[in-house]
Every structure is written in C-alpha cells, then in structure tokens.
Amino acid sequence: MLDVSGGTATNVTQHDGAILKTNTNGTTVSGTNSEGAFSIHNHVADNVLLENGGHLDINAYGSANKTIIKDKGTMSVLTNAKADATRIDNGGVMDVAGNATNTIINGGTQNINNYGIATGTNINSGTQNIKSGGKADTTIISSGSRQVVEKDGTAIGSNISAGGSLIVYTGGIAHGVNQETGSALVANTGAGTDIEGYNKLSHFTITGGEANYVVLENTGELTVVAKTSAKNTTIDTGGKLIVQKEAKTDSTRLNNGGVLEVQDGGEAKHVEQQSGGALIASTTSGTLIEGTNSYGDAFYIRNSEAKNVVLENAGSLTVVTGSRAVDTIINANGKMDVYGKDVGTVLNSAGTQTIYASATSDKANIKGGKQTVYGLATEANIESGEQIVDGGSTEKTHINGGTQTVQNYGKAINTDIVSGLQQIMANGTAEGSIINGGSQVVNEGGLAENSVLNDGGTLDVREKGSATGIQQSSQGALVATTRATRVTGTRADGVAFSIEQGAANNILLANGGVLTVESDTSSDKTQVNMGGREIVKTKATATGTTLTGGEQIVEGVANETTINDGGIQTVSANGEAIKTKINEGGTLTVNDNGKATDIVQNSGAALQTSTANGIEISGTHQYGTFSISGNLATNMLLENGGNLLVLAGTEARDSTVGKGGAMQNLGQDSATKVNSGGQYTLGRSKDEFQALARAEDL
C-alpha cells in the first residue's frame, strides 16, 4: 500500500491489486499502473487506478481525468472539484459532491450527493444514486443498470434503454425522461414526486399526486398512494400497478403478463383486462373495481361482492368474511381464497381455489384446477382436476372425470361418481356416494358409508379401509381385501355380504371385481361372475366359492369350489383345491406343484394339467375315479378344452380324449382312447402342444 497525502512519490510502479491512497491537495505522484502512466500534480489527477481499498479525494478546485475505480476502490469528488471520464467497474464506488462528467459505470456505483452534479453518465451496468440535493443530467441507462432518484434528487434527460430501470422515490424529480420499449419505470404518486417524459405510447406525467399515461413493463411499477390517482395506465409484461387504500385509478389497460393490485379500499374504474393480465384484489368493504375481463364480459368488485372476475397468471382474489364472489373464472396460475361465500366458480387447468373454515362454495365447476375445502362446498362438478376435502365437507358433488380426495376428518355427502375417482384417505368419510361409472377407493383409515355401487362402477376397499352399508348391483365391481377393517352390504339378489376380522362372506365379484384373500384370512361363499376374480393367497382359505364366468386363483387352499360355465379355477404352485365341482363349460387348471383332490368332474367340464413333479390330482367323472400322482396319470377325461401334457419320463394310463380335448405324450401312455373331436399328439414339443391347445382345432 502507498499512502501519499500532500507529499511526493515519483517513479511509482503500481502492480495489480496494489493499494494507492492519496488526494489532489498538494500531492505529487507519478508512475505506472496496469493501465499505463499516471500522475497527480498541481491539483490534477490523471489515469489513477483505485482498487482493493485504494482511495482518491479530489479536493476543492482539484480535478481528475480518466480515473479507473475497480473492486473495493473508492473516489470522492468534493465540493467545487471535478472528475471527467471516470470508469467505475464492478465493486467500485464514486461519491460526487462536486461535478462529474462523462462517467462510465460498468457494474459499480456512483452516488450523487448534495450539491453534486453528474453530466453525461453512461450506466452500462450498475447503479447511479441521486441523493437529496444531487442532480444528474443526460444519463444513459442501459440494460441491467439503474438510476435511483431519492427525495429531493433530480434527474434531467434520462434515457432508459430496454432492460434498464429508472427508480424514483417519493419526492424525487425526473424530467425529460425517454422511456424506451422494454425499460422499467418504478415510481409512486407520493407528495413531491415530479416525473415527466415520453414512453412508447405518449407523453406521460406523475406530478401533483396524479399519474397520466404511464407505461409499466419489465419490472416497472407504479404505486398510487392514498388520496392520489392514476389515469390511462398501461401495464405490459412484467409491469405492476399498485392501488393503495383511498387511491383511485381510471382507464387502466392490463395486458398479458402485467399485474394490477388493488389493495383493500382502493378504487380502479374502467379496467380493460386482456388475456394473461393478473388482477390481485379482495372483496373488502370500500374496494371498488369495474371493467371488462379477458372474455369481454363486464366485471366488478363493489359493495363486498365480486362478479365475473378472471384470475390467471398470478392473479388472486380474496373473498373476505361476509362477502361473496359470483361466476369467477380461475385460469392457469390464478388463485382464489374464500373466507365468505363463492358461487359458480370455474376452475380451469392449474387454477387453485381454497374454501376456508366457515366459508362456502356452491356449484363450482372444476375443469383441471384444484379446489381445497376446509369449509363447505355444495354441488361441485369435477370434470377434471381435483377437489380436496381436507377437514371440510361437501354435498352433492358430481364427479365426471376428475378426482375428489377426502381426508383429515373431511366428509363428502351424496357424491355422484359418473367417471373419475373418489378417494377416501385416513380419517376421511364419504356418505351416500352413488358409483355409476367411476371408482370409489377407500384407503387405510378411510370410511365409506351407504355407497350405491351400480353397474359399471367400482368400489375398492383397501387394507384397513372400511365400507359399510353398500348396495351392490349385479354388475357393480367390488375390489376388496380381507385385510379391510370392515365391509358390509347387500347384493342385488338380496344376500348380505361382509368382510370383518379377516373373514369374507358372500362376496359378489363381477365386471372387474376382485377379492384378495390374504394369508391367514378366509372367504366363504364367494360368488364370482363374468369378469370377477378371487385370489386366494398362501396360507389363506376359500370355502364354497361359485365361479360363473369368473376366475379363482388358488395359492392357498380352496374348499368346495363350484365351477360353472365360463368359470376357471387355477391352482398355482403349492396351492390346493379340495372337493372342487366342475360343471359343463367350467375349467380347472392345475399347475406344477399344485394339488386338487376329491374333484367331481361332470360331463363337459375341462381339466387342464400335466404329469409334472409335485402335481397331485384325484377325483371322479362319468368313467370312474381318476388321479395324477407320482408322475402317473390314470383314467383322465379330457374334453371341451381340457388337456393333459405327459412329460418325458412320466406316464398316462387309460386316458379318454373326448371332443374338444387334447393330450400330448412326450413320455409313455397306454390304453388311451381318442373319441371324435379329440386330439392326440405324440412327441411334439411342449410349446407346440400349448399352441395347439390354444387353437380351436383340437
């Protein structure tokens, strides 16, 4: 560091980062720095470099030319001193109480203090602050830079380029402003503020508490304070107009990406809202807003009522207690908070509405947005999107493609589910839902009471969920698990059904209905019709199931199953079927390591199996007893889709292959009888046989 104040230093070599502290008061310094030769002589400083804590005072009647102020460098131009062609780089600071001309600001800061004058400043980036009593003339404000005019500061002839900002505080003065397209003016209508100039549309003024023809864009902002006004304001993308309590605006144009915020008790008349323009307001008493929305409809907020308000693109409306909103449209990124009453809101994609405790919503139409209900919502229509009933309640909701979620002690009453989903979460309750074409899903800790399950609808009761008082039609799909806490109801045929304490009784499964009988639980007298399925897990037991077009998958134990036309019982590895009765058109499939004993195979019934290891089968048919044990099949009857695969190293004896039946022998067989319409294959691969079995040419 070199500190020279009033002394002499010659032949100085100032390296990068070196600190020079000096002034022009009787000081003589000469040498070189990274920018070239520099000197201070006879009160004149030339080409001085200031950085890293370096400082230069230009004393009264002294001057500085081509000073460079870098990071952490500072220069003070004192009263009656002058500085010309100063360059202020990033992190540099210049304080002016005298005169500064032709300054270039490249990321640094210039402070024009009391009695200071700056002329011809070019702000490429960084900031020029005009303090009380300071003045700036003919300033160019480029993109990314800003000029700040404080109270009693003055800016004359400022040119704001696109991306640049002119910020005028209360009581600041800015005359002859040239506001180019894409530039930002930040100001207010407070006492003493005096601004005039030209923007892309016209001559504009902010003076005497009134703003006229102001254009706001690209972070530009005008605050209209109490007892002042603004007329003919244009709010473009990135611009914002704030209307405070007891302030007034007239003829505001709110364009796409602009924001009009009318605070409680503010007034905005003749608003012209274009698509994408954001309105922020409330229904607080004393607030007055009138105009046309982006759909061309008249809207208003007055006398504690909002009508036809459009909220989008960060727009929001707060409906306070004791007030109401009618026919609001909430588009993408619009928001509505209701503490009072709301009627007829349309929630489009990515719009949000919150109904708080003690508030009400009636006839909302949810089309991709989200409504959260802590209060009461009646007759909502959910076409897409979601309604979340979180501790509140709903009545007569119509779900036609969207989702209703009921949680946290929320309650949904008399919901009509045409398509879409009603999901009941922990501590949520749905009462009296009518399930026509969509789904009601009851999750752990949820409760559905008195649901009507019509043809085409699905009621899904999951582990630790509860559904009581169900009225089930013949084609209503019940999906349930024996891990459900409690399920009760009545089938279309009047039979009562239930699931309690791990036991399922008289369950009807059809049209996509599924009962999962979990390990260490049971089912009794399940009716599985077309499209239904019962899954009996390992260590689970199913007794008395009737399959009429449906399917039972046995991984545990199935007792006394009856398989009617179209029904299929599949015994998986380690599963066991006992006393299954297969009627005409029914099918029993026993896979490797499966077991089926005491079977009754009636005429026209199909048995599908093989002589694989672990398969054990026994039963009776019209020709007597039959069995498969120890890789030996005896007296098997194969017809109407039945088939037997005799594997290599195994044997079949006395088999009968009837019409529609098939047998493939890769091992040995004896006394096989093949009737008309039966298919016997010797020596083909297993894959070829299975392909034939799938075809209807057997």
Regions found by a protein language model. Name each.
Residues 1-698:
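Long, low-complexity, polar and repeat-rich extracellular regions
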